[in-house]
Curated annotation (Swiss-Prot):
Membrane topology per record: Multi-pass membrane protein
Localization, UniProt: Cell membrane
InterPro entries assigned: DUF1328 (IPR009760)
Annotated NCBIfam families: PRK13682.1-4, PRK13682.1-5
Protein name: UPF0391 membrane protein ESA_03375
Record's keyword terms, sorted: Cell membrane, Membrane, Transmembrane, Transmembrane helix
Major localisation: membrane
Family: Belongs to the UPF0391 family.
HAMAP family: UPF0391
Lineage per the UniProt record: Bacteria, Pseudomonadati, Pseudomonadota, Gammaproteobacteria, Enterobacterales
Superkingdom of this protein's organism: Bacteria
Entry keyword annotation includes Transmembrane: yes
TM helices/strands, residue ranges: 4-24, 28-48
């Protein structure tokens, strides 16, 4: 998940540097969403892993 977030962030930075504002905003938004989902899944797996069967 974090890998995809970083990929979208790099795409957003490159698009912003080249002047593609709409694409940069879309890629930055996707990077934020993927990053938040990754954090949530990490926290869920962290707490679920500590439970006893």
């Amino acid at each position: 998940m974090f890998r995809w977030g970083i990929i979208f962030l790099v795409i957003a930075l490159i698009a912003a540097a080249l002047g593609f504002g709409g694409l940069a905003g879309t890629a930055a938004g996707a990077a934020k969403i993927v990053f938040v989902v990754g954090i949530i899944l990490f926290l869920v797996s962290l707490f679920m892993g500590r439970r006893r069967p």
